[in-house]
């Protein structure tokens, strides 16, 4: 019985919705398509080119994956590039170019087929269909496709009539597009504006009355205004909540662990100890570094724990404390060394190595738990401009995984060394990372996953990757 309970608490949860093996859901004659509460969702982008649809698609996908909702982007433009191999000019997108129109339609259908495979056979929960989808006819095809398979549909329409924003988007993103390899800036701008004109001729935005039964959000001019209609469930609610918090203002986020602590020196996890001598030196150097950066309107955040607060105090600037930034709660293993955990709880030590992301310390937390409590922090980071977050190893890994789009399996093993600042600068479709070591020595607290993760392993094998400590 105990083994069974162990299995139930340590096994990864699967989604409730289970697709039928056939292509379409079975339905009794005269009945409607069943709509399960947890049925898969198609998020469908709508809008003219250079309106930030791909930016929104990738960013939203990264967020949903981070919170544990399996999500994938299906970019129809990439299907088109794969099918045509070469791009000549805007004339490919003319409405009277019948041959090109046929290719574009086939690419969209191919992408929809892959959406079905992902949602029905690959345990996906959300598929983001990234294309212009500017006509009612195209959107009707997508709606019918989703209806036949029992998928929910949520539209995201990005509307922008500010020529400066459009030109900036073309310059930042389209210049590096495979469509324009080797082209100069002026030719790219000219051709892409003509491509937009081709779509503009037949553009039919979502209509307040005609589309009143649909679920959607309209985003005007990169978030200056929003219109939300008929949100159906928590996935759509979270998508709306997220989209209303993000912005594109240039900024940097600085992540740093606290200075080396007294318990770090002893190789003990958790606790609430103060800084070591070297930790205090780092706090001083961190203050000098931040001052040298001359960062406008910098906000500084810490956890409620002594070692992050002592680190922030050395900066001589105002700071805010977040309980959500506290280190992972190791429960019964608090303030123990890895050697002591292996000695007292060898089974728990092995179970954590088997699935470090989902393993929860007895009476403590898992990395998965930390991600859930960090969601408000991520939302506020998305709203802010320049921020320095002084936190802890597990927390920093979770934040870093969000910005770098890392999987749950990669997250617990991201390297976040002491006395090092990570400067994260959002770029077009990702995040640029700079690692700045402030030249103050510290112990190594990073433990790699050992080769043998079985409960029956020898203690030497279990402790093989434990870093040296005093």
From Swiss-Prot:
Catalytic reactions on record: beta-D-fructose 2,6-bisphosphate + H2O = beta-D-fructose 6-phosphate + phosphate; beta-D-fructose 6-phosphate + ATP = beta-D-fructose 2,6-bisphosphate + ADP + H(+)
Residues holding beta-D-fructose 6-phosphate: 80, 104, 132, 138, 174, 195, 199
Regulation: Phosphorylation results in inhibition of the kinase activity.
Region (6-phosphofructo-2-kinase) location: 1-249
Domain of life according to the entry: Eukaryota
GO biological process, one term: fructose 2,6-bisphosphate metabolic process
Pfam families linked to this entry: 6PF2K, His_Phos_1
Keyword Transferase: yes
Record site feature (Transition state stabilizer), residues: 257, 264, 392
Binding residues for ATP: 47-55, 169-174, 349-352, 393-397, 429
Protein's name according to its UniProt entry: 6-phosphofructo-2-kinase/fructose-2,6-bisphosphatase
UniProt organism field: Aquarana catesbeiana
